[in-house]
Amino acid sequence: MATTEPPVSTRTHALVFLHGQPGSSTDWQQVTRLLPAHWHTVAADRPGYGSNPRPATGFAANAHDVFAQMDAHGIQRAVLVGHSYGGGVALAAASMAPHRVEAVVLLASVGPGCVNVWDRLLAAPGTGPLCALVAWRLTPWIARARLAWLTWRQARPLAPGEHVNWQIWGHASRGHGRLWRTFLAEQRALVAELSQVQAAIALVQAPVLLLADPDDRLVPFGTTGELAKMLPDAHLELVEGAGHHLPIRAPGVVADALVAFLGRCFRQDAPLGG
């Protein structure tokens, strides 16, 4: 029986990748390597992280930073790809300036129902700073101890895609003294601003692809389901067995989904943005 290959867009897409919390631009390396060579990809550190000199801030200000990054790279319109917290940034940007966003791809994105008691505790005016500092000091230490035990038990080094959450936290505090403040600022924004991002979802005009693992332990799968219902033009795909960190644990699946999604959305050969 003949099979039909998914449509592939031949347009020169510009894609801006937004990492999660904590995270960095390097989280996207495995994904961008697998994308068509003629696509223009930008993966930069968000405010408060890595090489970005801007202080940590909320969703709206992060969105303005996205537009600044686009301007710096000569990109007029782009496809925004956001993971976790970065998904909230992508939604904020798409609702603020629909004319600059051609499509949105959300990987295990924050959204309705994702804020829990721990999030609210970390964002509280009195206890928040102390809890954030203690958590930032203790969690990496615990993670490194766990990673050492796992390495010993397996009698080999861990691969990049193994125990990703432990690996991310195990390296989170090394050489980045300001990160606990970034963590605190973003927790406060998550609690204070997420409802505003959700309220503006109806303003998102671009087509949206949502990717998530039903067994995600960090952002409930129900959050992705609610986003799919709220967004005017959304398509949901499951990525089973990858957990929360899809860019690292399932880069091939993510890249293939991106290519297929943009192929369906843009079948003409006219140039895109930029």
Give the label of every model feature segment.
Residues 204, 210-212:
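Short beta-strand/loop motif that positions the catalytic acidic residue
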Residues 95, 104-136:
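Flexible "cap/lid" loop of the alpha/beta hydrolase fold
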Residues 242-251, 255:
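Catalytic histidine-centered segment of alpha/beta-hydrolase-like enzymes
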Residues 191, 214-219:
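Acidic catalytic loop of the alpha/beta-hydrolase fold
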Residues 19-21, 78, 82-84, 213:
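Conserved alpha/beta-hydrolase "nucleophile elbow" surrounding the catalytic nucleophile
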Residues 6-51:
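Conserved HGGG/HGGXW glycine-rich cap/lid loop of the alpha/beta-hydrolase fold
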Residues 106, 115-117, 139-203:
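Conserved alpha/beta-hydrolase catalytic His-Asp/Glu region
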